[in-house]
């Protein structure tokens, strides 16, 4: 009995002391004018609130209660979620470059060669130099148009496959990924590389572990968690396989004389600049490998993800599909080839793509990191704090969008919004200094294939599924990919019938 009483007293005292500590912790935070957030648990912070949910969904719920600038404690990591266009504009434009860093994760550090790339590199001379080379040599509007014959060639290959599969179930997730990968390989590297399908799968797996939610990311001071992190071993196995593939690409380019265009491709340019004594930051071989992996990560995953979400939403909304196909078939009738200039006429289809990116942004949570202490919406954001811009949440906010949960492309006829980085409630490609440099290239790789898929085929869901039966869930990870593959049945369209 005495032991039970003593135990009860100890528990009561411990609870009282813990409550005092928590109150003192909250008081000290409020005195610092930090952003508001839900009550935290010791050690884990707010991790329990993310359990069983996708982070962008859980953080959207928090913003409804605590406001558009929300403090989220992820283990040891002080994080801030921005969920309004005003706060996002302040962080991505007015405070740029104070918020222009990327936060590091175990996934990006291992798979992207210590972040020696463009996507995950900190804001630095190296990042500026590599981005400039990328834009001028690969991703300019002129170059995007010059790649038209590659898009046409690879699209013809896909159309032939779909024609031969008429009436059969086709895994469109697999086919669109292959199409996008082939276009990117030929445009960037001069040819379709060996093991490209395996590399695409490695990219997908890498991005799923690059969001910064591994235990070793959330408790960086714990040597034990870092040592016991099972995914770390998996990442290193993946990295060794990636390195083997990328090393082969590098060696092949050292030996070859010219690419598909009969001249330099982007890797040849990087090798040439590697030898240039005038460049500001030396370009290492690892930086070239990281750039190649970037090209697959940003190009293949985001373009194919958007195309698949467009097709999924069209299948779920037959009236929208019918309207989009009517426009495409009227505008493209009689044309033997289709490319960037042709799709500019397709206003409704372009609105369909916009509406898809509103509801299914390629990167639901854009990752940033503070380079210095700053202030957003009057709240103090500490140096090195992790910042996550909830693009998914802003795309479904009724303050900015009428009927936000309805797929309604016509909204863009009524409200002039684009995704070029100036409308901060709609930034699927990011904004500010770190806006996606491949915006034009990626958009062309979505719109041109989409127009031809809508023109040449009528589509049905597999196995008699109804539109209302479709699973529109997203998978976990940095990119907002579909949780399940998209299975469709194509029927060739006869313009003369």
UniProtKB/Swiss-Prot annotation:
SUPFAM superfamilies: Cytochrome P450. It is a single-pass type II membrane protein. InterPro entries: CYP450_71D, Cyt_P450, Cyt_P450_CS, Cyt_P450_E_grp-I, Cyt_P450_sf. The chain crosses the membrane at residues 2-22. Keywords: Endoplasmic reticulum, Heme, Iron, Membrane, Metal-binding, Monooxygenase, Oxidoreductase, Signal-anchor, Transmembrane, Transmembrane helix. It holds the Pfam family p450. It catalyses: (4S)-limonene + reduced [NADPH--hemoprotein reductase] + O2 = (1S,6R)-isopiperitenol + oxidized [NADPH--hemoprotein reductase] + H2O + H(+). Its EC number is 1.14.14.99. Coiled coil: none annotated. This is Cytochrome P450 71D95. GO terms for molecular function: (S)-limonene 3-monooxygenase activity; heme binding; iron ion binding. Belongs to the cytochrome P450 family. It comes from the Eukaryota. The keyword RNA-binding does not apply. It is found in: Endoplasmic reticulum membrane. Signal peptide: none annotated. Its cofactor is heme. This gene is normally not expressed in wild type plants. Gamma irradiation induced probably a mutation in a regulatory gene, leading to the repression of the native limonene-6-hydroxylase and in the novel expression of this previously silent limonene-3-hydroxylase. Heme binds at residue 436. GO terms for cellular component: endoplasmic reticulum membrane. It is an enzyme of class 1 (oxidoreductase). Hydroxylates (-)-(4S)-limonene to (-)-trans-isopiperitenol, a precursor of (-)-menthol. No activity with (+)- or (-)-piperitone, (-)-isopiperitone and piperitenone.
């Amino acid at each position: 009995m005495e032991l039970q009483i003593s135990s009860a007293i100890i528990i009561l005292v411990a609870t009282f002391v813990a409550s005092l500590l928590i109150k003192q912790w909250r008081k000290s935070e409020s005195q610092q004018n930090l952003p508001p957030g839900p009550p935290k648990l010791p050690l884990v912070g707010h991790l329990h609130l993310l359990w069983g949910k996708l982070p962008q969904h859980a953080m959207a719920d928090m913003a409804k209660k605590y406001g558009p600038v929300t403090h989220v404690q992820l283990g040891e990591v002080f994080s801030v979620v921005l969920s309004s266009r005003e706060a996002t504009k302040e962080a991505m434009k007015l405070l740029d470059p104070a918020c222009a860093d990327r936060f590091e994760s175990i996934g990006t550090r291992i798979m992207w060669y210590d972040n020696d790339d463009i996507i995950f590199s900190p804001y630095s001379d190296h990042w500026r130099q590599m981005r400039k080379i990328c834009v001028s040599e690969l991703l300019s509007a002129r170059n995007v148009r010059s790649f038209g014959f590659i898009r046409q060639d690879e699209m013809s290959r896909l159309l032939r496959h779909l024609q031969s599969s008429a009436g059969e179930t086709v895994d469109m997730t697999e086919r669109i990924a292959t199409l996008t990968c082939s276009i990117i390989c030929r445009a960037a590297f001069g040819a379709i590389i060996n093991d490209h399908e395996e590399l695409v799968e490695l990219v997908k797996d890498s991005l799923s572990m690059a969001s910064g939610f591994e235990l070793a990311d959330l408790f960086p001071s714990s040597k034990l968690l870092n040592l016991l992190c099972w995914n770390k071993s998996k990442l290193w196995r993946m990295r060794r396989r990636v390195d083997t593939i990328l090393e082969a690409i590098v060696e092949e380019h050292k030996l070859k004389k010219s690419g598909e265009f009969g001249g330099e491709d982007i890797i040849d340019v990087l090798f040439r600049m590697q030898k240039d004594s005038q460049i500001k930051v030396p370009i290492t071989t690892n930086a070239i490998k990281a750039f190649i992996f970037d090209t697959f990560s940003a190009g293949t995953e985001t373009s194919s993800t958007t195309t698949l979400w467009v097709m999924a939403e069209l299948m779920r909304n037959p009236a929208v599909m019918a309207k989009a196909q009517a426009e495409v078939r009227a505008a493209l009738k009689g044309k033997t080839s289709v490319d960037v200039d042709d799709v500019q006429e397709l206003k409704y289809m372009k609105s369909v793509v916009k509406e898809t990116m509103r509801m299914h942004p390629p990167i639901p949570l854009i990752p940033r990191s503070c380079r210095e202490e700053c202030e957003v919406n009057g709240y103090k954001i500490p140096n090195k704090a992790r910042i996550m811009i909830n693009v998914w949440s802003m795309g479904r906010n009724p303050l900015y969008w009428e009927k936000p949960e309805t797929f309604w492309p016509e909204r863009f006829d009524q409200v002039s919004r684009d995704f070029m980085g100036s409308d901060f409630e709609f930034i699927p490609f990011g904004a500010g200094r770190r806006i996606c440099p491949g915006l034009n290239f990626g958009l062309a790789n979505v719109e041109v294939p989409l127009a031809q898929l809508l023109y040449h085929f009528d589509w049905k869901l597999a196995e008699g599924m109804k539109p209302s039966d479709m699973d529109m869930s997203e998978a976990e990870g940095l990119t907002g990919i579909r949780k399940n593959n998209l299975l469709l049945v194509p029927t060739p369209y006869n313009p003369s019938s």
